[in-house]
From Swiss-Prot:
Residues 30-299 form the CoA carboxyltransferase N-terminal domain. It is found in: Cytoplasm. Keywords: ATP-binding, Cytoplasm, Fatty acid biosynthesis, Fatty acid metabolism, Lipid biosynthesis, Lipid metabolism, Metal-binding, Nucleotide-binding, Transferase, Zinc, Zinc-finger. A zinc finger (C4-type) spans 34-56. This is Acetyl-coenzyme A carboxylase carboxyl transferase subunit beta. InterPro entries: AcCoA_carboxyl_beta (IPR034733), Acetyl_CoA_COase_Trfase_b_su (IPR000438), ClpP/crotonase-like_dom_sf (IPR029045), COA_CT_N (IPR011762), Znf-ACC (IPR041010). Component of the acetyl coenzyme A carboxylase (ACC) complex. Biotin carboxylase (BC) catalyzes the carboxylation of biotin on its carrier protein (BCCP) and then the CO(2) group is transferred by the transcarboxylase to acetyl-CoA to form malonyl-CoA. It is an enzyme of class 2 (transferase). One of its GO terms (cellular component) is acetyl-CoA carboxylase complex. It comes from Crocosphaera subtropica (strain ATCC 51142 / BH68) (Cyanothece sp. (strain ATCC 51142)).
Length: 317
């Protein structure tokens, strides 16, 4: 065997170091490989960094329970309406019955539906929070998701709380037909009443936020925050290109593209999200306990003016 044949054999039997790293088996979840930069990170370090890659800043998807733990102060979370569960009014069946799909997804994820709602404290400030979970049928918005979010917003309006909804969804749930689509208007109506009460609403757009969620409550915030490099849009890129027969620009439907064109107000890293939300709420919140309703202020001003006139009349006498 010549030296050239020997080297050729070694190249076939032993892949390069980079290839070995890519194909390395990650045993028992001890290490996690970044899907963006392929760097291997100790899983506990990744979790301590809120599932943000320490090498490239890639944001991994986060389960709703973990997101709640990241945002809410410890032992302050109180779930709302967690007893609501989806039904199958249309007896819908695609590859399998919708009722079976619900049960299978509930067993797999441990969730009742694609959103968790509740109240708690964020850096000591009261907050009504909704967190969508993409693991549950792609975070799709059905009747239960719409009802839970609507009740959350109505409760926040009644109790004068700011609302934050963390969005992660493929859109409306097709298995529920019109019952799913009507949730867009239903939630939007609840948010309008919340806005009329001069209360703060902030949606946080994560990867991905698409479809009917984008077309409704995801874009109705007083301030709209997005995570870095999140896919945000209505229809998919391929669908738009095939419909328009045009090539879309690079980076289209990313949070950076939307920020550049004025559709979102800020891109905030997950590691800074709690701090940022708390600061925004603290800026907005003090105006409500300090300032009474407008009609009360007007009465107070009128009464104060009368007192001044009486005192001036007394001095003149």
């Amino acid at each position: 065997m010549s030296i050239f044949d020997w080297f050729a054999k070694q190249e076939k039997s032993e892949p390069p170091i980079q290839q070995q790293q890519k194909e390395r088996e990650i045993a028992d979840g001890l290490w996690t490989k970044c899907v963006a930069c392929t760097a291997l990170t100790y899983t506990k370090d990744l979790q301590a960094n809120q599932l943000v890659c320490t090498e490239c800043g890639h944001h991994f998807r986060v389960e709703s329970s973990e997101r709640i733990a990241q945002l809410m102060d410890k032992n302050t979370w109180k779930p709302l309406n967690d007893h609501l569960t989806p039904t199958d009014p249309l007896k819908f069946c695609d590859r399998k019955p919708y009722s079976d799909r619900i049960k299978d997804t509930q067993e797999k994820t441990g969730l009742v539906d694609a959103v968790q709602t509740g109240t708690g404290l964020i850096d000591g400030l009261p907050l009504a929070l909704g967190v969508m979970d993409f693991r549950f049928m792609g975070g799709s918005m059905g009747s239960v998701v719409g009802e839970k979010l609507c009740r959350l917003i109505e409760y926040a309006t009644q109790e004068r709380l700011p609302v934050v909804i963390v969005c992660a969804s493929g859109g409306a749930r097709m298995q529920e037909g019109m019952l799913s689509l009507m949730q867009m208007a239903k939630i939007s109506g609840a948010l309008e009443r919340h806005r009329n009460a001069k209360l703060l609403y902030i949606p946080v757009l994560t990867h991905p936020t698409t479809g009917g969620v984008t077309a409704s409550f995801a874009m109705l915030g007083d301030l709209i925050i997005a995570e870095p490099n999140a896919t945000i849009g209505f229809a998919g890129r391929r669908v738009i290109e095939q419909t328009l027969r045009e090539k879309l620009p690079d980076g289209f439907q990313t949070s950076e593209y939307l920020l550049k064109h004025g559709f979102v107000d800020a891109i905030v890293s997950r590691t800074q999200l709690k701090k940022t939300l708390a600061q925004l709420i603290s800026i907005h919140q003090p105006f409500f306990p300090v300032l009474p309703p407008l009609n009360v202020r007007e009465k107070h001003h009128h009464h104060h003016s009368e007192e001044v006139v009486l005192k001036m009349d007394g001095k003149e006498e």
